[in-house]
Amino acid sequence: MALNQLSLSLQFARFPGVEAHRAALPRHAVVRWIRHALSLDAEITVRIVDAEEGQALNREYRHKDYATNVLTFDYAQEPVVMADLVLCAPVVEREAREQNKALHEHYAHLLVHGTLHAQGWDHETSAEDADEMEAYETAIMQELGFADPYAD
């Protein structure tokens, strides 16, 4: 399978415990995970933040006053996908622990999820759209060698 091209900027905010998140997100793996979810070439920035920055961004842009796992800011979908993906490290870490997943596996899923959002996929418009997006995410994760992220 031919994968699309990706120009990636990978950024880590400064926060306690950031090194564990750097270790879970080697650049080559992040590139691989995102490229598997792309249907077009892309320029994507991935930023790993603390709870304070994650909450501030979610409050400002989604009017929800809490830190969420991933925020997608899509700027263009054609001819090149241009987006920022912001992942909140404490939320991702907590969810991985609660779901009995390795940290890198949960990051892989959220990067796939965010990359699909950057290309116009939406799970909040209808149950049918949510099912379709989840099925596609599951297929991508299995291509990458991971288990179904939605399995109980």
From Swiss-Prot:
User: Which residues does Zn(2+) bind?
Assistant: H113, H117, H123
Top-rank taxon: Bacteria
Subcellular location(s): the record lists: Cytoplasm
* Keywords tagged on the record: Cytoplasm, Endonuclease, Hydrolase, Metal-binding, Nuclease, Ribosome biogenesis, rRNA processing, Zinc
Q: Does the keyword Nuclease apply?
A: yes
EC number(s) on file: 3.1.-.-
Regions annotated as coiled coil: none
The cross-references to InterPro entries, in alphabetical order and at most eight, read: MetalPrtase_cat_dom_sf_prd, YbeY, YbeY_CS
The UniProt entry lists the main location of this chain as cytoplasm
Cofactor binding comment, as recorded: Binds 1 zinc ion.
**A Gene Ontology cellular-component term:** cytoplasm
Q: Name one GO biological process term.
A: rRNA processing
Which GO molecular function, any one, fits this protein according to its record?
A: metalloendopeptidase activity
- Is Metal-binding found in the keyword set? yes
Fetch the PANTHER family from UniProt.
Answer: ENDORIBONUCLEASE YBEY, CHLOROPLASTIC (PTHR46986:SF1)
Primary role? Single strand-specific metallo-endoribonuclease involved in late-stage 70S ribosome quality control and in maturation of the 3' terminus of the 16S rRNA.
Q: Give the family per the record.
A: Belongs to the endoribonuclease YbeY family.
Protein's name according to its UniProt entry: Endoribonuclease YbeY
**Gene that encodes it:** ybeY
